[in-house]
Amino acid sequence: MASSSNSYNSPCAACKFLRRKCMPGCIFAPYFPPEEPHKFANVHKIFGASNVTKLLNELLPHQREDAVNSLAYEAEARVRDPVYGCVGAISYLQRQVHRLQKELDAANADLAHYGLSTSAAGAPGNVVDLVFQPQPLPSQQLPPLNPVYRLSGASPVMNQMPRGTGGSYGTFLPWNNGHDQQGGNM
Amino acid sequence: MKESSRKQGAASPCAACKLLRRRCAQDCVFSPYFPADEPQKFANVHRVFGASNVNKMLQELPIHQRGDAVSSMVYEANARVRDPVYGCVGAISSLQQQIDVLQAQLALAQAEVVHLRVRQSTNFPGHGLCPDSPSSSGSPSSKQVSPQDNKGMFSHMDIVDEASLGESMWSC
């Protein structure tokens, strides 16, 4: 991997895009390989190379890969949807959470109803061994698009973020699953 | 009115021009969305996206879409400032995990509902006298109403689906 940043090898996607020499200490080289030119093109268009350089320099080295992948995801979302970016995906997911919570509440109401109904029947010959297994979520009614609350909710899953290449982030595109509008792959 | 006030210098510059230390022109792209009394709003957007990038992105959009674009960029910039590693992707991941948990719980609850309905219907033929059961209609000893019960359950579920939830995306 270190050899990929040498001057006699091909430059990284960033230096190729910016038409400059890829130095051994290039901060982009580990995360923007030359075979993924679109990844950097999107990040550069939305965030700007100097902004990304500043952002990466402020992070610890072991955090930069996740940061680049999340920036690439957001940049691609912004390129696809210049108005809403990845906030459109967040809004879609929030509506999903809201809908599922309502369905769960209705199912729990059904369970309560049948529990009372069975006990009201007073059938002496039967052993009523009802176990109410469902556990409703703690009362986390999600306020719509509140950055502070949204991010505090995000922190428990910080360690569980997938650490693959940009390709693995394709699984995080909600409209690939829920929306039929988008064609799909990059 | 705006012209005269701007030319006279009575109007203060928008938050963007104030931060960038430049003159706020009459046709400033930022001024409708970054008022002077919200300096942090533009500061975060400038830090994450860069003023020239935001300017370019707004210029490429029709005017009636720029407000939403600014709101979403403000949201993303705030998320990135608070979490420089994951930004909005952290929120997306959290929501996806919540969906997984809710779907699992819903599947359990629905399976339990079906189980209780089947048990209730199969218990009735064994007893000739069941006048107390409120959910039974007619003579239970001669009925096998499982399919109808299933229909009832699903038709009940259909009521829960809301096609038009509130479209208010911005609550900043």
From Swiss-Prot, chain A:
Coiled coil: none annotated. Induction: Positively regulated within the shoot apex by both ASYMMETRIC LEAVES 1 (AS1) and ASYMMETRIC LEAVES 2 (AS2/LBD6) and by KNAT1. It holds the Pfam family LOB. GO terms for molecular function: transcription cis-regulatory region binding. GO terms for biological process: organ boundary specification between lateral organs and the meristem. Keywords: Developmental protein. The keyword Cell cycle does not apply. Expressed in a band of cells at the adaxial base of all lateral organs formed from the shoot apical meristem and at the base of lateral roots. The keyword Heme does not apply. InterPro entries: LOB. PROSITE patterns: LOB. Residues 10-111 form the LOB domain. PANTHER family: LOB DOMAIN-CONTAINING PROTEIN 4-RELATED (PTHR31301), PROTEIN LATERAL ORGAN BOUNDARIES (PTHR31301:SF91). Not known; ectopic expression of LOB leads to alterations in the size and shape of leaves and floral organs and causes male and female sterility. Belongs to the LOB domain-containing protein family. This is Protein LATERAL ORGAN BOUNDARIES. It comes from Arabidopsis thaliana. The gene is LOB.
Swiss-Prot record, chain B:
GO terms for molecular function: transcription cis-regulatory region binding. Expressed in young shoots, roots, stems, leaves and flowers. Residues 12-113 form the LOB domain. Residues 125-152 are annotated as: Disordered. GO terms for biological process: phloem or xylem histogenesis. Residues 131-147 have a biased composition (Low complexity). InterPro entries: LOB (IPR004883). Belongs to the LOB domain-containing protein family. This is LOB domain-containing protein 4.
